[in-house]
């Protein structure tokens, strides 16, 4: 053991030891309790950033802690390798995305290993490998057979220059981020997965997720968006057709003054053929983003269609407007407008001088100026004919029943959740295994012809999908009639890859089936770690896919992740680290200067996992100083501990002196609190406990036999508490100080109940409520002994002097108050 702390050397030796001994490679073992710890897999950008390091350090602390507890721990790592970022990087560098991606993976794998994470690298997966996406294609075929994968027209953001669909974040001021072209709303044919078939179960099973953050549960509940409402039929004034409206407010039905339909509604398109003004308006609407949030905040605009509908109860004529705020994807693309009781309808009505008809007044009868603002709270019905004077809550059921009984409507449970559009007009993704034949139509690729390989030698240009230009890919023969046919050139949304990867880690070597029985052993994941930005999309899709895999008989649980931790961001100068802000700190530079253990220790100590972490250079220096202090202390006690650790009776040492028992009690109290905090995932306070223990031990001397044994016990506790957080130095010191074997094989320390037993109490002594002294008494001391000890305390006697004592109050285990 060197006298000076040399992190580069000891970390290299520890990592070589773990690799040579395959320390973290695990097998299924039914005799042991399993623990599956997983951090969200990264996109291989080529460089780890501090957000990665924090995420993976938190996961590694949890995994190593569970190893110490004797569990069979799986902690794998892989790469979310498909997607737009790799394609864009390849365009800029004029090289194939496959080459760029694999080069980055190699670089990032090395960086992860330098941090000493306890990953089972034998299970590594890369989503752009055909061995992985082959089974994704197989899964798509199963969904297609069950009617859960289907194709339909959908509205997208379309870049007319690059000839591709854009995500909302790729649009800047209404223009494509690369081409600068004005983005259009276009209806194109796309593939969808029928997640809506699982809406009710996805909502209901949120109640099972007792160890998920409440914020994530709420976000998913709102995204699924269950509502109870009524479908109401509005007949067109002319002809047999009708418009169906879904509403959660049938109590306001008598206040409808117009209907609004989406620009993509068939009726709007039909009217555009006969009106240039309407056609121009629809064209303008095409230049609006398709995101619901964008549509909600944009200026409300519309145009009169010239058509009328008939109110189902009053039989009044209602004008039908085409409005840019109505979503075709929501319900039927038709809204019944009640401007007196809906803020959006009110804003639109005032702009276009449409009538307001109040039908609910405040329950307390106070006047409301409906011209100034919509009244949206509960109240009493007015101007509603036979429904007058009914409270609005009761009116929901009364009017719903009336509509049903008169064939004008029906109750319906509605979900905000839409089916999952997985088509991407991109190259770098999983090919959708579908063939189009002029004779046979849409034909799924036979399973024995999987995988449909993505050509990896293509250099994309950014103008449309290169797969459409690659004849060797899209030209094929129909598997049914053997005539010339074409492949689907859309690729899958990369969220598909990340929706089932956690299960594939259980059997990445399996080439006969998608998942084998090992998946049932390891799933569900016991602890999942990742950012809250994935609360809705990724986590919801993974829950959906888990239920699909369960229904296919491949898994036997309802949910993919038992416990979820959403770590906070890493900030510097109050802002998230980013290259554009110039506030990035690279992990590699810190590892080179201080070592991986220092980086890990700072990351863990600086903030609780779920809170944002403010970067501090002085905090990193402090973590480094602590490890040097630990190393120096260990070097000083090395010879004494090696000698004690060779003694057979070392574990049965009895401490007699009160000061030694008190010191031991302090150590075990720190251990007790640290264990509570480990279970609560409050690792920063575990580090605080470790620092307290070291400060206690440093004051002891190895020249005293009792203290030397205290140092041995305390150091053994300290190193095991640190082992999940700073594994390299803990591994090295455990062996150098003669504790024997691999520290990971050492059981997690538990406090000794005897050490925690208090033999003496410190009580405060008051005179007329003012603090005048402190006394030490045996834990079981009688009231008489406590009174006597208090009255004989030197400072108390001085304050009493010749005063007459009226009463002595003893509050057990707390204080004595002498009244004079």
Swiss-Prot record:
Highest taxon of source: Bacteria
GO cellular component, one term: cytosol
Cellular localisation: Cytoplasm
Residues binding ATP: 579
Gene3D superfamilies hit by this protein: 3.10.20.590, HUPs, Isoleucyl-tRNA Synthetase, Domain 1, Valyl/Leucyl/Isoleucyl-tRNA synthetase, editing domain
Catalytic activity: tRNA(Leu) + L-leucine + ATP = L-leucyl-tRNA(Leu) + AMP + diphosphate
Gene Ontology molecular function, alphabetical: aminoacyl-tRNA deacylase activity; ATP binding; leucine-tRNA ligase activity
Family: Belongs to the class-I aminoacyl-tRNA synthetase family.
Name of the protein described by the UniProt record: Leucine--tRNA ligase
Upper lineage: Bacteria, Pseudomonadati, Pseudomonadota, Gammaproteobacteria, Legionellales
Gene: leuS
